[in-house]
Amino acid sequence: MDIINRGIAFVALFLSVSAFAAFEDDLPYLKSKWRSDVTDKSTGLGVEELKVKAEKIAAAGKGVKPWCLVKAEIFKMICEEMSVGFSPHDAFPAFSCWSKKNRVLTKLINERIAEVDSTYCPDAKVKSKEVKGSILRHDYDHAVPDWDRILKLGFPGIKAEIDASKATNDYSKAMRIVADAMLNNVKRLVKIAEDSKEANNPVIKAEIVALKNLAKAPPKTAYEVMLFQLLFFYYGEHLDHLQVRSLGNWDRLLKPYYEADLKSGRTTREEFKNLVKHFWWQWGSLDNWWGQPVYIGGTKADGTTEYNEVSRIVLEVVDEVHVPTPKLQMKIAPNTPDDILSKALDMARRHRSIVFCGEEPMAKAMAAMGFSAEEARTLDIWGCYEFQPRAAANTTLPCIINMPRIMVDLLEKARIGELKAATFEDFEKEFHRELERRLEISLDVVRAYEANMDEFIPALVHSLSIKSCVDEGKNAIGNGMKYNLSVILQAGSGTAVDALAAVKEIVYERKEMTLAELGQVMADDWKGHDELRLRMRASRRKWGNNEPLTNKLKRDLYRVFGAAVNGKANSRGGKFFASGHSIDFFYIMGRHTKATPDGRMKGEEFSKNISPAPGADREGPTALVASINAINTRDIPGDIILDMMIHPSTIQGEKGLMAMKVLIDRYFAAGGCAMHFNVFSAEELRDAQEHPERYENLQVRMCGWNVRWNDLSKKLQDAYILRAEGVLQP
């Protein structure tokens, strides 16, 4: 009891204004923490030394022990031997394995994948090449822990539960090794902190007390919750090599701890907010390209909102620290408090990293996938804006279909005389048939890849957070969940639709050239046809303008896509679903795809997600939402995302906020699940390109994450400027 009382005293001291210098004084350390090795080298090994030891363990175990046990032993070694560090400028420890691009296990896992493929599915890679321009991959790097459960257990409870499990297979043995290693690492952190030169610093003292408490019990204070989350994240993502793709429903999770801290006098609102800033900066410093997801909001079982005072503090912190990551996702419903929605929308128009996710349309999409209303109410948002039943599902994203490449290949066949289409309807049917063929091949390849996930990615830390996996000794990222989902993504559906409309106009309506001749123009990248290219690029007959032809083409395209994918069995006891998500493949694939008849040149980016192509939506946001209303979003239940670019002059002041609310309401009513904003003028972006030193903090929404403008290549910057030039102005 005495240690708990002393811990409370120290935590109170830690949270007091006197324990920290001004937050700005801590920033230099916080910014550098996860971008260089700030650990005390006398405490252990750096990442390169750990890699050498890991490779020796792997070599010794090869052919002798199951991979899950070898991986667990490597995890244990890292926990015991990596160097760590503590700073008076930070509430959280540092570790030597800090880089996402240089994790200890990366090389070993890639080698393991190659070995598993050559053993179990040697033909899959060859077969995947038939899906030209698309990407078929081993996608395993997504996990959402059951935060509710493990916050109640703590590290000792996690260990006790796996020790008590009746499962006796190799996987459960590996989980026991990892549970022991995590708990022992917490104890090791205590000893290193106590032995450090800074041990008497108030901040380090508070950290020692919190770590001691976590070594004996579940978190009891808001600070201990944050420390637990950071440690569990680190163990899973950096040591066990599986991305933790959400910190959970953060305001709901933190609320009881924050309120207990307030009631006991351990903290004040401002002191808690200061601590949240330090927590936020852990990921601000990591600064990985796609960001660390966290979400707030939701609806309770009684229909009232989950938003609370922690939600408001989170918004204030996101606004004030202004870093691209963590990226904030917000559940939006009719019960969302107006002050919270207004604050968030105002932040979005000032370039903060927020995505708005509609509870009602997500519930409809979940229903289309066969999930219950309760599973929809409590769903986790993860990744960019994906969603799944909380603590009951895993999701892979193993395939990204390149839709414009189908157009390129059909026109090439026409050019060499292998394709004839007397009518546009014949050509569209051929496009759909080819899409179906590529999807059928893709699903077969994915089944082969995913059938052996346990052999290369035993997700040991994540599995410890899932009750059924602990009880049954199963892999949470393989087939160990209630729902094991495989979602098929697409890139460039808007570009493909615009290209179809262009083929109809050029070949079948205006009869300016034959299909074969158009194929030659595309092969030549529009050379000698600049006038036609500019006309097609400027055409209003493009997806996103509420234009009847492109609305129908998009609806038919998604119908074919969904019918070929949704509900089909995968190889993990689950199902496939189609998604409107493209991640960043809209420009990755665009770089390697030849010209398309919509005016796009070779190498230019595609449309992303369900959005229009750059510069295509010239009729304004209302027309864009009307276009979305014209499709059946249930055809792509895996995710329905819109990237909305708006001219800043159209959403100024209170009327501007109201316009944004109306836009979101209409989009959600149309079945869209997630929306994010880029609020820029072309003039501002051109000035930022010319004078980067004036815009060091300018952020743009890339896809499901924010990036700093100055970190983009000129080609990507030019694409944003092109899109901004087409935005409707007053």
Model-predicted regions and their roles:
Residues 9-18:
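Bacterial N-terminal signal peptides
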Residues 22-175, 198, 202-210, 217-730:
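Conserved catalytic cores of very large enzyme subunits
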Residues 173-185:
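Extended non-globular scaffold/tether segments
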